[in-house]
Every structure is written in structure tokens, then in C-alpha cells.
């Protein structure tokens, strides 16, 4: 018989009760409100990014497992967990596809709006990990010239496919996808510093859908660019109003918030906890998942970029997120910022979308390369 256990779970973790209830008693609480008292009888703690997991929270509790359903790690004191034999699992890569789709969707939208062709542009990816690799794959499918900057990978792989940061900053479009670190040889805090941003030219496009603080925001404000796409902010939920006003697209750290990314994070932590307690996973929770979106039908224009834009507009529209935060004045209202993130509208990732095959085999192959199902 399975011993009685208690799990305290951030109530923003999707499908928490459906996934975890067979493992024990599930207590769902707002992540920012979880405190030591709530954990007195808890065996496991499952969080997103709003709970600071450290000695102040866990000391004098019986928590033996901490799971984070998001990829960021700066809310978890990992040395403390290790020193106290508390197992930690983070759902690394769970939202990588969602973030890559956010970046590519915005680039396609910009190309249509500003009347340029993506296949004629160069894209530098700063940080080629879970997200960067998927951005690379999608950008190459669209015919872009892709340049890669990732010093740790360059050293480890001894590969000449990577370039240094100064050369990467010469690209038409620059997107950052590193973790946020403040120490070590490859620290990324203010990686794009005042000196680096002085190299940026007015025709370039700059994107941050990684972590706030990788780009020095005060320097960014004084950097003339063609366009800025910003999802991550240095002091969020305090959004820099000057930078916000310079952004073509400004969103409240939701690039990784596609429903499928959240589900993946929940499931990854669930399976890790099952392994920790040596319990067989139960897949019956899947019956609660929503059905796939309706099929997408398309009338081709003959221009692949325009046709891809028409498909993507039926999947997710970042301009609607931008309009929502501007209409609600989220830039100066912390509660609205958090509310929008917690009540984020559902959208699905491209692999969940079915597109009816078109008469153009080349375009069908492009859709397949981007991850769509063809029917």
C-alpha cells in the first residue's frame, strides 16, 4: 500500500490534481503565498517561478523533493537543496518550442509589416541550447542565414560553426537565448552591455525572449534599432517604461506560455517524482486534455512568406498580447502584470495544429519542417 503523502503545488501548475492526486494529498496554493507553515506536513513541493525555494522556506520541514515546472533556476537555492539531500528536478526544455514559435511568429509578422524578406536576412542566435536550437531549425527552414554564438558549446564541441559575440552582433536580427548567470567565465548578466550595444546599427532588430538582465536595459534605451521585440524584463514585474515605449512588441514574459509547454513542464516533474518515489506513472490524466484545434485551410498566394504568415495568424498572435498589456497599462500595475500571466489565454503549439495539404509540395514541406501536421 502506498504511504500517505502530501504534495504542495503552485495552483498555476496545469493539470496538477489530474497528474499528482494518485501520489498523495494535493494542496494547491498561489505560488507567491506558499510559506513554511504550508510545508510542515509536506513531502513534496511543486512550483513555477513565483516561489523562492530556499532555507527560509524549507528549514524544519520534511520536504524531500522539489520540482520546478519552469526552466528558470534563479528562484531555487540548489546548493541548499543538495546540502540537505532534497532531490531537485527542473523541467528544462519544456517550453523551448513555445519560445521558438514566439520568436519566429514575431519575425514573420515584422517581415510582412515592414515589407522585407526573411530569406534575405541574417539571424544571430546568442545561446544555442534548448530554445536556440529550435529557433535555428525554424529559421533555416525559412531560408534565413543563421549564425550561432555559444562559447560553452564552442569550447566543448571544438566546432568552427560558432562565431564570437562581436561578429554575431553584425547580423540583421539578433535574438538572445542564454540562461541568466552572474558569475563564472560565461556570465550572461548584461552580456549585451553598453559597449556591445554601441555596435548595433539602426537597421538591426533585437529580441529578448530569454531572461531579463541579459541585455542592459538602460543601454538598450539609447540604442537605435529598426525594431525591438521584448518578452523578458530586467526587473519584472517592474517593466522599464522607456524601453516598453520603444518596443514594437512588448509582452509580459509569456513566450513560453503555450498550453503544451505548461503541460510538458507538469508532466516532466510528475514523472521525476514518480521515479523518486518508485511509483509507476499513470497516464489516465490525458483524458482531461483539450481536443486539438480545428484544421487550418489555406488559399495560397504564391508567396511562401505571406502564406506562412496566414497560417501563423491562425495559431497565435503576439500582437494581441502586446495590445492587451498596453490597454491594461500593465507597465505600471504589478497586479495586472501577474494577473495576465496567471490567466493567460490558451494557445497551442504548432505540432498540435493540422493543416490541410496544399497543391504546393514545397510549401507543404515547409509546414512540415516547422512542425505542423499535414492532413
Curated annotation (Swiss-Prot):
HAMAP family from the UniProt entry: PdxB
Subcellular location: Cytoplasm
Protein name (Swiss-Prot/TrEMBL): Erythronate-4-phosphate dehydrogenase
GO BP annotations listed: pyridoxine biosynthetic process
Coiled-coil stretches noted in the UniProt entry, renumbered to this chain: none
Residues involved in NAD(+) binding: 150, 178, 231, 256
UniProt xrefs under CDD domains: ErythrP_dh
Keywords from the named record: Cytoplasm, NAD, Oxidoreductase, Pyridoxine biosynthesis
Catalysed reactions, semicolon-separated: 4-phospho-D-erythronate + NAD(+) = (R)-3-hydroxy-2-oxo-4-phosphooxybutanoate + NADH + H(+)
Amino acid at each position: 500500500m502506498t504511504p500517505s503523502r502530501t504534495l504542495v503545488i503552485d495552483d498555476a501548475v496545469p493539470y496538477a490534481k489530474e497528474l499528482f492526486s494518485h501520489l498523495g494529498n494535493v494542496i494547491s496554493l498561489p505560488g507567491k503565498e506558499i510559506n513554511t507553515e504550508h510545508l510542515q506536513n509536506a513531502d513534496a513541493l511543486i512550483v513555477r517561478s513565483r516561489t523562492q525555494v530556499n532555507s527560509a522556506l524549507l528549514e524544519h520541514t520534511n520536504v524531500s523533493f522539489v520540482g520546478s515546472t519552469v526552466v528558470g533556476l534563479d528562484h531555487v537555492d540548489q546548493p541548499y537543496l543538495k546540502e540537505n539531500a532534497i532531490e531537485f528536478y527542473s523541467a528544462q526544455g519544456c517550453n523551448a518550442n513555445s519560445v521558438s514559435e514566439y520568436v519566429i511568429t514575431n519575425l514573420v509578422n515584422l517581415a510582412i509589416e515592414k515589407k522585407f524578406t526573411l530569406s534575405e536576412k541574417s539571424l544571430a542566435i546568442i545561446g544555442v541550447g534548448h530554445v536556440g536550437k529550435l529557433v535555428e531549425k525554424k529559421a533555416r527552414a525559412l531560408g534565413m542565414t543563421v549564425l550561432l554564438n555559444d562559447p560553452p558549446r564552442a569550447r566543448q564541441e571544438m566546432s568552427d560553426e560558432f562565431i564570437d559575440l562581436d561578429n554575431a552582433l553584425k547580423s540583421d536580427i539578433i535574438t538572445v537565448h542564454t540562461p541568466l548567470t552572474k558569475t563564472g567565465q560565461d556570465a550572461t548578466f548584461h552580456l549585451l552591455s553598453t559597449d556591445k550595444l554601441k555596435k548595433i546599427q539602426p537597421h538591426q532588430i533585437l529580441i529578448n525572449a530569454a531572461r531579463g538582465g541579459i541585455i542592459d536595459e538602460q543601454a538598450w534605451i539609447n540604442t537605435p534599432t529598426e525594431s525591438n521585440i521584448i518578452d523578458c524584463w530586467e526587473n519584472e514585474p517592474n517593466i522599464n517604461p522607456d524601453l516598453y515605449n520603444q518596443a514594437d512588441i512588448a509582452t509580459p514574459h509569456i513566450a513560453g506560455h503555450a498550453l503544451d509547454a505548461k503541460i510538458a513542464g507538469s508532466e516532466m516533474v510528475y514523472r521525476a517524482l514518480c521515479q523518486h518515489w518508485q511509483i509507476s506513472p499513470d497516464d489516465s490524466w490525458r483524458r482531461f486534455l483539450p481536443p486539438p484545434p480545428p484544421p487550418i485551410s489555406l488559399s495560397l498566394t504564391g508567396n511562401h512568406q505571406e502564406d506562412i504568415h496566414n497560417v501563423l495568424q491562425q495559431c497565435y498572435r503576439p500582437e494581441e498580447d502586446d495590445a492587451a498589456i498596453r490597454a491594461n497599462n500593465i507597465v505600471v500595475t504589478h497586479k495586472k502584470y501577474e494577473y495576465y500571466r496567471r490567466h493567460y489565454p490558451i494557445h497551442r503549439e504548432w505540432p498540435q495544429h493540422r493543416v490541410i495539404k496544399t497543391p504546393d509540395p514545397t510549401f507543404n514541406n515547409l509546414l512540415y519542417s516547422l512542425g505542423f501536421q499535414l492532413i
